[in-house]
Amino acid sequence: MSLLPSSSTGILRIFGWFAGVVLPVVLLTALFALILGAGNAILGTWVNQFFSGFWKWLTSFDFSIGRVIFWTFVTLLSLALIRPAQTGRFWWEWMDRIGRFPAPTKPSHAYWRSVLILVALNAIFFAANSIDAFYLWAHQSIPQGVTYAQFVHQGTVQLIAATLLSAILLIVLFNQDESLSGRPVLRTAALVWIGQNLFLLTSIALRLKLYVDAYNLTSPRISLLIFLLIVGGGFIILSFKILREKSLLWVTGANLGLVFTVFYAVQFLDLGAMAAEYNVSRWERNPARNLDLNYLESLGSSGWHSLQRVAEKPEPGGDPFGVSAFLAGVRRDNEGGKFNVNWRSWQARRAWNLHQLLSSH
């Protein structure tokens, strides 16, 4: 380490610390383990097992291009988080520079252009929301000749795209000079448009509910609902920008914080199990409903508890659905060691679900 220049930083100093501190410890430990292992049969067995296992672990790595690139990226990101560089505001100044557009040469033209855009788009959204209010909210039905799949799948994508484009357009309009964005008429029209976008999001959620009522709930449909909540939260953040004249940097940071918080929280939820429990609960209340057992079985461990509830439901003729046989197969697979997977494939959720299944047997 003393041979390195005093000005050296980053990877050179990390390598020097490893060579001067870690490497001698590793080498001396291995040397004395081998010497003592040669004079002690039990210790020697342990040392041989350790080195054999270590060599097997070292040579079993998957050095494919994709994995090398991914873990290199993770390593570099981890180093940056452990010891961040002193960049100051260098990486964020560009956002401040584009936070506001320059003042227009003809303010009246820019003002009326913005007003007419908001008025026209409010009128279009009002028409779409009025149709939804009539068919969805008042009658809770779909037009004649339109299937639930068409009503949900073909309509939802376009409506979500419309709301996202609305958010982008509002950001552009209210990054104009404050002499324009601060006008009460523009603010009022923008807030009305945000309200219409939120109503449109609730209509999409109601479309999803009608589809689930007709068929079943699945984890992707729960994910769609979570996505709608994120978009709605983004519009609320946008409302604060408009009312408080927040910068583009603030809007970006607030939205990134919202997305990170939701994604971090959702990873702890078992969406498959939630969908399975919901479907089985509705089937228990109304056995005439169609219950997609193939979907429950495809969920793996997330569907075992719900399948156990189906198996415990008394049915004429024994087990007409074959659920008990399926769960018995899961138990046999466990006894046969099928679930004793590599430690890298171990999942706490599956282990807990397996414990629940076996304890209920």
Residue spans of the language-model regions?
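Alpha-helical transmembrane segments and their membrane-interface junctions
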Residues: 26-42, 121-140, 203-210
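Extracytosolic and intramembrane catalytic regions of membrane-associated proteins
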Residues: 294-361
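Short aromatic-rich membrane-water interface segments that cap or initiate transmembrane helices
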Residues: 14-17, 52-69, 144-161, 217-229, ...
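Juxtamembrane membrane-water interface segments of multi-pass membrane proteins
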Residues: 2-17, 46, 80-118, 131-151, ...
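Extended, domain-scale alpha-helical bundle/helix-rich regions
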Residues: 16-91
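Hydrophobic alpha-helical transmembrane segments in integral membrane proteins
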Residues: 262-289
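Alpha-helical membrane-embedded segments
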Residues: 26-31, 65-82, 228-239, 256-269
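Internal/C-terminal transmembrane anchor helices
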Residues: 118, 122, 248-271
